[in-house]
Each structure stands twice: as C-alpha cells, then as structure tokens.
C-alpha cells in the first residue's frame, strides 16, 4: 500500500534514514531565497543534489559512505524544497545552479564533484555547462535532458537543458543504451 503525506520532509525524518549529525549547516541567501545546506566529513567535496519534490535528506544513505571513503559530502535543499525557501520567481535549473554556486562560495569550495538525480541531475549539468571550472565531474541519473518522449511544456525544457546536456555529455552519450 502506498501512503501519501502532506509533509514529506517531516515523515521522511521520522520514518526514513536520517542524515548524520553535523555542526556545519546553515542557510545561504541567493536571489531572493534562503538555501539550506549541510556538510559532513572532510576531503574532496562532493555536492549531492536531490530530485524534484525531494530534499537533502534523500541522500542519507550515501552521506556516511562518502564520509567513510574520505570525502566531504554536502547536501543542499533546492529552493522551495525541504528547509529552503523560495521567492515568486518561476523555478528554473539555471536559477538552481546559481543557488549551488552560492553555497559553494559560502563554503569556500573552488571545485567539487557533483552527483544529482532527476531535477538535481539537470541542475548539475547546467552548472557544469555554465561554469565548468567549478565542477570536477558530474554523476547524473534519472535525468530528463532529452525531451523527445515528453509533451512540450515550453522553451525552458527544449532550450536550456538539452543544450546543457549536449555540451557536457554530447548527444551520442544520451542515446547509448545500457546493456
């Protein structure tokens, strides 16, 4: 049976895996929103970007593994998700990429590896496309960067994300089948 909850963050914190304790967390103001982040461990930074309607706690199983492997794991709640606020601007991956850069700047991170799923994957590709000098590498999955099988909802999907995916991964990479 599938259950639905009005406040998924509260439910997940009570019923799902929880992030480890950390004193390194807070908010960064960027373009009208307060963006929440938490950092764990030390070493080379790895940014973890969640999917739409998710939050940083969705990475609770991965954070300890990254820390034990010698990485500094940073989770970020996208604007309007989890603990982060939003303003009246429409959501866009470009805007969310600037939120990630603002967190990187606040934490004095020059360059980081980025892992993202779904909307977090789209944001990571936009980030790598716009400011490749700040991105050591991108691991992305469940990313809808090729809209050919979806109903067109505007130039946002067709323009920005496809261009970003092609510039980072190349069009042939997006068409490869997993065997």
Question: In which residue ranges do the predicted regions lie?
Answer:
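Alpha/beta-hydrolase fold catalytic core
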Residues: 1-46, 68-71
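Conserved HGGG/HGGXW glycine-rich cap/lid loop of the alpha/beta-hydrolase fold
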Residues: 33-83
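Conserved catalytic-core motifs of eukaryotic protein kinase domains, centered on the activation segment
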Residues: 58-60, 84-90, 149-152
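Active-site loop/oxyanion-hole signature of alpha/beta-hydrolase fold enzymes
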Residues: 68, 75-115
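Catalytic nucleophile serine of serine hydrolases
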Residues: 84, 118, 142
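Flexible "cap/lid" loop of the alpha/beta hydrolase fold
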Residues: 122-130, 135-167
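Alpha/beta-hydrolase
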Residues: 167-179
